[in-house]
């Protein structure tokens, strides 16, 4: 057949009369527009795709379950490319057969980040599949529906410099935590406590005596508040305090629900059947997130929650030995308290240590918060009233801590509701040296000895470091046991100090502050300068994460944030605000603030953006961020190879080279940056590879093990591969410096989970000597990707050290490092495909609300079988942009196999049901009126210039070649 008829009908036309047609359009069913924009808030009610109406940052982690399956808009592009690259194989029967690279095809489909969770209508009488648009409903025969996919776009706003074809790039940057705002860690009195002055003394030389209730400045029952004189006296150690539990208003209803469960348990005479662990965890979950919401939780949260539920079931059994001990009759013991005590024991055993407010798992954090509302300082009460002590197997120091009380808790500054002027405690964190004036000859080694004497300095523990090196030489790299905090001295150890645990309320001395309070700590190996101090709130709480809450806020520059390795001292959030589904809404101030950075215009000119918008679109910010990130990473890593230059010339380091010449594809993905690093620095190639090739190179390297992995590296990067092969005969330090490039292959990715939250990988650090340090990936001390890695690479050795002869230990260390990287699977903790790969529709819908509005369409591909195999695209859409532009956008969906797309037909429908048709390529059209009995409709006749269409199972065949 060379002609396809598509009926277009309005309300009142009997649909069953069109049963013989494979593709029909109902222009009588529509969603009313509001204010000239499509009402995207109706999407959850439509037969379209699965996006919930919720906060945009919450929506990023929604697992789509209300759908009829996923489709890939580019599945034809991928499979056609696989078809094009078939290889002929002569079989034993001398018959020639063709085989596609099915491994590549399967990887491409799995790696696609634009999967659409469709929620369609199914007509079981005629077996049609219905897809809703805002101006129409499209139905297609189920035999042909496998190539249908939505084609939605946000309309560009010229004043904002929009380039919405880069929406995927924006999506990518959020996933790799490079489009985020930060707030420093904030600490305050736990809102679950009332801290009451019980007694006072005039100076610290007077001890507090049991039973003494002497009051000097305050009346009985005075509660301590941070903006009150009582707090100053407390910090001076002049007050003896009593802690009582209280319920914050924000979680009062949730605590009441827990109380109902507790009361049912008590009234049933402690029947374990009344303890439904899943129901308990549901309420606790709400409490945990309201009190300290990090929005993104650990990937293994679900598994740990199940273990917690099992521990609850076990601990409430009537014959559990510890339960029997808790139920021994003593004065002051109450059943309500016992309920929360048993919850605490179950949670502590689940995590195998004491639980603190800073615990990363909300299911444990929340049970602590709930228990504190009833018991005050929980662990202290468990020890003094119930004779329960933390296990000897728990983390070090927890045994000694149960004698004290801890009144401070970490709170997320993004959510903390407080008026300007309120006193808080917070961590300042900045780079010790953002840049330095150096020469190639002197290098930029890590300086152990800061110029300021009035600081605490984080130092390496030579004994512990020596023990680690001996273990590595004798037994290889132990990724589970080698930790950075273990090789640092205890004083000023920024990986172990924790104000929540170090500031405590003692029985005799009142509150004692840690010695590092209000003092600068310099950690040279992290290039970090930190101080915890009292500060004031500067701005009210806002949904916009870019609003800086304090008078001394953390940096906003996205590249500086990538250099702040010690992420335990700040919180981050995607720089997005508002709802996932909205017709029109305000944009975060993030983009406007980033546009004020030095060099902003120069960076954008590299991307072809000459006119700089005052209020840029997020796609502009995304281009700026990734371009600057690429230049910064290249500049830092170039210092680690031997260079022919003026060794005494002074230059600023690190500093991105805005004049760096590179060619080829635009950089839209971190994998392109990583591949470019090796191409540019080692292979002297300035061409940027496309995103698919770059991602596949990284995948192939990860897929191999041992010698095969090194061979694949050498296949793509011959010069770098030969340098790795020469490690066995390494003679000077420069010969082993190339090892520090290997982590690039394994740390970054937008759909990966590290194998463990606290495994470490080896990295060379250059001080006055060459050291190897454990770089912890995915741990509580850093974020993800290259954040854990980048700042260490700012350090590089002097020329004298580069050319110094390797000692025997260094040579052995280098071989063990290469062995580790040849076999590591640190990146292979699984993925989160259902969540991560289905968010492109969400980003496009959200971006539409920030810019010019939303347009939608749906595309179907018709296979042509004669005289030459090809495809044509048929799209039904609204009329908000010219059809020629829509056709161009369809061509962009075929970056790998565009030669097969020989034409397109665009059917555009306006708000009142009128339609126009546009065609190009081998497609032409004719619109006719059709009378059927007493009913009328219109038929769009698509003609294909002598080409014959057919092959209903085109996609099925392509996926099985």
From Swiss-Prot:
Give the signal peptide range.
Answer: none
Which BP terms in the Gene Ontology apply to this protein? Answer: clathrin-dependent endocytosis of virus by host cell; virion attachment to host cell
The organism's superkingdom is given as Viruses
Entry GO CC: viral inner capsid
Q: State if Plastid is listed as a keyword.
A: no
Print the keywords alphabetically: Capsid protein, Clathrin-mediated endocytosis of virus by host, Host-virus interaction, Inner capsid protein, Viral attachment to host cell, Viral penetration into host cytoplasm, Virion, Virus endocytosis by host, Virus entry into host cell
Q: Which GO terms describe its molecular function?
A: structural molecule activity
Instruction: Name the principal localization, coarsely classed.
Output: virion
List the Pfam families.
Orbi_VP2
| Similarity comment | Belongs to the orbivirus VP2 family.
Primary role:
The VP2 protein is one of the two proteins (with VP5) target of the host immunogenic response. Responsible for viral which constitute the virus particle outer capsid. It is the major attachment to target host cell, probably by binding to sialic acid. This attachment induces virion internalization predominantly through clathrin-dependent endocytosis.
Q: Per its record, how is this protein called by name?
A: Outer capsid protein VP2
Species name for this entry?
Bluetongue virus 1 (isolate South Africa)
